[in-house]
Amino acid sequence: VLDSYVARTQRLLQNPAAPTSLYSEADLTLYINIARGQLAGEAECIKVLGTIDTVVDQQAYDFADIDTGVAATNGVQGVINVSQAWYTVGTGRKWIAPKPWPWFSLYTFNNPVPQGNYPTTWSQYGQGAAPGDTGSVNGGNFYINTPDQVYSLVLDCSCYPIALVDDTTVEAIPYLWTDAVPWYAAAYALWSAQNNARMADAERYFNTYTMFVERARKASNPSINRWMYSQSGDPAQAAKMQVQPRGGAGG
């Protein structure tokens, strides 16, 4: 898939062949991988049920320790955020209630002598993704109420992909979102030129990227209960913000 990304990005940039190439293939590969990471975070399109085992009396767990499968097989590098959590019981699972960090800090964390129990609440604290090829040493983590024994947790994770190094690298980003990647990569290349005309072109390309991301989300959600997915946005948002139709048009 990398070769296809590079070719499509070159066409968008009308990149001439060597020796007058404006953007090297190495640079385009870098921009493509940046685009893929940003897309994965924005669209939350790489979903994995990750797993992690608790440690007795340990509340904090790093995203980096969540098992999301074999990266070389599924193309997943790591976790960006967690939206739901369960713990396994017998052959089934029980839901763990998510809480905002201020609530968790006051009602669960705020205890000099915490008592062990089965998982009842959890909260994300750390932000962002690491490690992998991010260059960051920090990353997200989450807390649960003090576990009294080892529990196997199942986590609903939004993930980011491994970097593409050649055409055999597995792509974790699903279609239709893959159509957006070359547009972001081309925009990034034009931004790097630091030229007014190219910067203007970059904004147009970025707007096209945004359109493809939105279309992919709409296409991926079923017609029934379309708005039940958090990534879809709120159809009543305009009314809540008291935004009026242009030109006095009716609602």
Question: What residue ranges belong to the model's regions?
Answer:
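Glycine-enriched, solvent-exposed interface loops adjoining structured elements
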Residues: 1-251
